[in-house]
Amino acid sequence: VAGPFRIPPLRREFQ
């Protein structure tokens, strides 16, 4: 659970 929208590859945004 990296965020509320872990479906799209936006992991760089919460990094």
Swiss-Prot record:
GO BP of this protein: defense response to bacterium; defense response to fungus; killing of cells of another organism; xenobiotic metabolic process
Coiled coil spans: none
Protein keywords: Antibiotic, Antimicrobial, Fungicide
Record's subunit section: Heterodimer of a large and a small subunit.
More about this protein: Antimicrobial activity is not affected by salt concentration.
Role this protein plays: Possesses antifungal activity against P.infestans but not F.graminearum.
Name of the protein in question: Antifungal protein 1 large subunit
